[in-house]
Amino acid sequence: GRRMKNVAKDFEKSRDFLICIDSDGCAMDTMDVKHMRCFAPCLVHEWDLGEYRDDIVRLWRKINLLSRSRGINRFKGLAKILVEINENYTRVDGLDELIYWVQTTDELSEESLREAYERTGCNCMKKALEWSRLVNDSIVMISNSRKSPFEGVEEALKLIKGKADVVIVTASNGQEIRREWEDSGLMEYADLLLSQESGTKEMCLRSLTEHGYEKDHVLMIGDAPADKMAAESAEALFYPVLAYQETESWEEFAEEGLKRFLEGTFAGTYQEEKIKEFYANLDL
């Protein structure tokens, strides 16, 4: 959409290489705490699902942490679980309209959802908005000590500094991610932050690659299949951070991945090997 172009034109290429980094569950150890203490409980509350609480929390965790859809945008995750709730637990009013919005909007953000709600008056959209705001408020309430980077991240960022441009690319709320990077002193290592307000990860990566980097000079670091797909669609390389082996992944990137990326030996066997480990780790 119109906004994306703005975001990209603010960015200036200053090095020959570009590294894009996802935040939640990749650079930041925030995935479990946000999903188990914020997203899932707020869902149970907003749709009054107390009697199915354990099932719903388990289902939310499976969709958003332990499957192919790990790390997807919150509204996509919400639509997915509401479909299951509607089929197996209790009727969800207005679900079709919410699903239609999720599938067709060019921006999966609160602002875009609010515009759609004002247009349609759909009850499910209203609840989705209230849920999302509740989630934001509850994330703010989590203490900073529970929202810190994985071990190995800062060391890797120090090694990258000066060698590649660095952009945080997240499907989360931009304000929240900026605050987390600032609080942990990592924002100084990043040149730009692109979030759900900027557009999809694919759009963000594509617009960044249009800044004149050579082939195989752009790398996405992520922990979810969605990150890999975004990298592929922008013809970028992909380095996976393995769920529950994050520190090891970052240490290996610092020791080997980065060097290969800068020397041009990342594509091919090394990347294929990493992606194989990535899929095996998520049981895909």
Which stretches of residues belong to each language-model region?
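Short, Lys/Arg-enriched N-terminal segments with co-localized hydrophobic residues
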Residues: G1-R3
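Extreme N-terminal starter segment of soluble prokaryotic enzymes
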Residues: R15-I19
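Short amphipathic alpha-helical segments and helix-helix/interface helices
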Residues: E154-K158, L205, K228
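C-terminal accessory extensions appended to soluble enzyme cores
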Residues: E255, K259-L284
